[in-house]
UniProtKB/Swiss-Prot annotation:
It catalyses: tRNA(Met) + L-methionine + ATP = L-methionyl-tRNA(Met) + AMP + diphosphate. GO terms for cellular component: cytosol. Keywords: Aminoacyl-tRNA synthetase, ATP-binding, Cytoplasm, Ligase, Metal-binding, Nucleotide-binding, Protein biosynthesis, RNA-binding, tRNA-binding, Zinc. This is Methionine--tRNA ligase.
Length: 677
């Protein structure tokens, strides 16, 4: 029976847009997708959304290293991420970016409401500054020893060992990740969110019983140690949204990142021309359900800051957080050197998506436990469960139905009571899917698969097929096997979308949860084709080797204009205004005796002549070709005495040097002596 339809909004944590999706990411997205697909099968209205987390200094610096703009980098990463998720059949309704108009507007709205309600405080702080790079260091670009648990090599905003959050200035023996230098202290005005004002509300939310026990217990520890005001601003240079009425100050990435859930949903509503659903889902008294699937490393932000921000800006809070653990491979942390740090795209070159979806699902529960991807066990389990128990059930019976009965199933069930046992299991299996006890659901389904295969073994259709006058028995036995297979695949449909499509094509019928009580009787199925292939350890070995090769390729140095010559330290407008750039006509150009690099240029500034030595000879072997051409020069550079004479300025050129030097020229119409601004 179809349940009362609910309105549900589901999100996954936003992948950071500076790297590829790997198997650690995929645990969460598979877990959420299985749950979402089950909810859709039960008739609920589900909106499943995600986005790239696209702001912060790490993105700014990596784009600089790659020689591209941050916008270009996050655009490329978004396409890569979406391709990976589509490859794993993650059924998002919308995938957006935090670097969007929707997210900017919502971030400014929430900030403004918090400020108007008195929850934003200003104060001057002492901040770590990299004296070598000339920039304030964001949290993730300082490493040191955690001030709480004393674990070494921890980032400046939170400890990955004990989960504590703190200020970078609290780190013991901090070092700049950018240069390795020891940071110095500098003062800067920052904006703070008054988290302690929400302590009572957050404790009540914790005690509501909705959160996982492990999450609630951890939150209680944080309450007992006392909540602190949260620094939500960062200084330029920074890639993100500038804070309204605060030039040079930007929203910290963790302020606008969770707002990205709202921004992605707003974008989806706008695409649909839906003007009501956004408010319906996000208003303070909304009766829609909101669930965030997240990893245990970001519980602090989602269980404290996020609900407090929503409460303070008059939006609804999450219905629940569904928190999972980490992924290990072969019992250890994923390793690039061992080839177990595996990208999603690499996996799909060696295995199908359903195989990993099944293995993760079989190991997941509602607890925050780490999941180990044991690659040998993975091969054994996929072959034993999907191939031997489930798909084999169909192949053992379909051949007889196709060949002997033209694909038509029997008019009656051979064993109605056995069939009822299978359909009665829907309640237990459905509850397991609902409560995210995925491993339990798989165990229940595989136990039924064992029963179904025992039935076929006992009935032995291959023996019956050879006995005269038993065609009706043969049809009934095989039809029973196929109907049991159909029920099993209906239960597995949230997990195995690709296999389910093939099964639906064979059965000539959709796998519908609410239709399992009605078996397929006198129903024509299509010709059976192989549904799933066995896998082996040779594929695993190839996967691991490919991952190692990718690491080697990624280690190759990045080249490009910005990578080879990084942008210099930011200067003020007043500094720039001191440089006097002028259009100059090249009146004469000649070689310099005794130099294989220099040309002597005579420049006309429209009433004043200048003598300039320029190191452009390698790119302009015929100096006469430059005569009559206009260029741009620094006119107020102090004269420089050289052994060939005095150079009275500098002409502007681009390129890395050698033969790749390109003299700059103004557009037609510019006149000698005109200022370049």
């Amino acid at each position: 029976m179809t349940q009362v339809a609910k309105k549900i909004l589901v999100t996954c944590a936003l992948p950071y847009a500076n790297g590829s999706i790997h198997l650690g990411h995929m645990l969460e997205h598979i877990q959420a997708d299985v749950w979402v697909r089950y909810q859709r099968m039960r008739g609920h209205e589900v909106n499943f959304i995600c986005a790239d987390d696209a702001h912060g200094t790490p993105i700014m610096l990596k784009a600089q290293q790659l020689g591209i703009t941050p916008e270009q980098m996050i655009g490329e990463m978004s396409q890569e991420h979406q391709t990976d998720f589509a490859g794993f059949n993650i059924s998002y309704d919308n995938y957006h970016s935090t670097h969007s108009d929707e997210n900017r507007e919502l971030s400014e709205l929430i900030y403004t409401r918090l400020k108007e309600n008195g929850f934003i405080k200003n104060r001057t702080i002492s901040q770590l500054y990299d004296p070598e790079k000339g920039m304030f260091l964001p949290d993730r670009f300082v490493k040191g020893t955690c001030p709480k648990c004393k674990s070494a090599d921890q980032y400046g905003d939170n400890c990955e060992v004990c989960g504590a959050t703190y200020s970078p200035t609290e780190l013991i023996e901090p070092k700049s990740v950018v240069s390795g230098a020891t940071p110095v202290m500098r003062d800067s005005e920052h904006f703070f969110f008054d988290l302690p004002s929400f302590s009572e509300m957050l404790q009540a939310w914790t005690r509501s019983g909705a959160l996982q026990e492990q999450v609630a217990n951890k939150m209680q520890e944080w309450f007992e140690s006392g909540l602190q005001q949260w620094d939500i601003s960062r200084d330029a240079p920074y890639f993100g949204f500038e804070i309204p009425n605060a030039p040079g100050k930007y929203f910290y990435v963790w302020l606008d990142a969770p707002i990205g859930y709202m921004g992605s949903f707003k974008n989806l509503c706008d695409k649909r021309g839906d003007t009501t659903s956004f408010d319906e889902y996000w208003k303070k008294d909304s009766d829609a359900e909101l669930y965030h699937f997240i990893g245990k490393d970001i519980v602090y932000f989602h269980s404290l800051f996020w609900p407090a921000m929503l409460e303070g800006s008059h939006f609804r809070k999450p219905t629940n957080l569904f928190v999972h653990g980490y992924v290990t491979v072969n019992g250890a942390k994923m390793s690039k050197s061992r080839g177990t740090f595996i990208k999603a795209s690499t996996w799909l070159k060696h295995f199908d998506a359903d195989s990993l979806r099944y293995y993760y699902t079989a190991k997941l529960s509602s607890r925050i436990d780490d999941i180990d991807l044991n690659l040998e066990d993975f091969v054994q389990r996929v072959n034993a469960d999907i191939v031997n128990k489930v798909v084999n059930l169909a192949s053992r019976n379909a051949g007889f139905i196709n060949k002997r009965f033209d694909g038509v199933l029997a008019a009656e069930l051979a064993d109605p009571q056995l069939y009822k046992t299978f359909t009665d299991a829907a309640a237990v299996i459905g509850e397991a899917w609902e409560s995210r006890e995925f491993g339990k659901a798989i165990r229940e389904i595989m136990a039924l698969a064992d029963v179904a295969n025992r039935y076929v073994d006992e009935q032995a259709p291959w023996v019956v097929a050879k006995q005269e006058g038993r065609d009706a028995d043969l049809q009934a036995i095989c039809s029973m096997g196929i109907n049991l297979f159909r029920v099993l695949m209906t239960y597995l449909k949230p997990v195995l979308p690709t296999l389910s499509e093939r099964v639906e094509a064979f059965l000539n019928s959709e796998l519908n949860w609410d239709a399992i009580e009605q078996p397929l009787l006198s129903h024509k199925v299509n010709t059976f084709k192989a549904l799933y292939n066995r896998i082996d350890m040779k594929q695993v070995e190839a996967l691991v080797e490919a991952s190692k090769e990718e690491v080697k390729a990624a280690a190759a140095p990045v080249t490009g204009p910005l990578a080879d010559f990084p942008i210099q330290e930011t200067i003020t407008f007043d500094d720039f205004a001191k440089i006097d750039l002028r259009v100059a006509l090249i009146e004469n150009a000649e070689f310099v005796e005794g130099s294989d690099k220099l040309l002597r240029l005579t420049l006309d500034l429209g009433g004043e002549k200048r003598n300039v030595f320029s190191g452009i000879r390698s790119s302009y072997p015929d100096p006469q070709a430059l005569i009559g051409r206009q260029t741009v020069m620094v006119a107020n550079l102090a004269p420089r005495k050289m052994r060939f004479g005095v150079s009275e300025g500098m002409v502007m050129a681009a390129g890395p040097g050698g033969k790749d030097i390109f003299l700059l020229s103004p557009d037609d119409g510019a006149k000698p002596g005109q200022q370049v601004k």
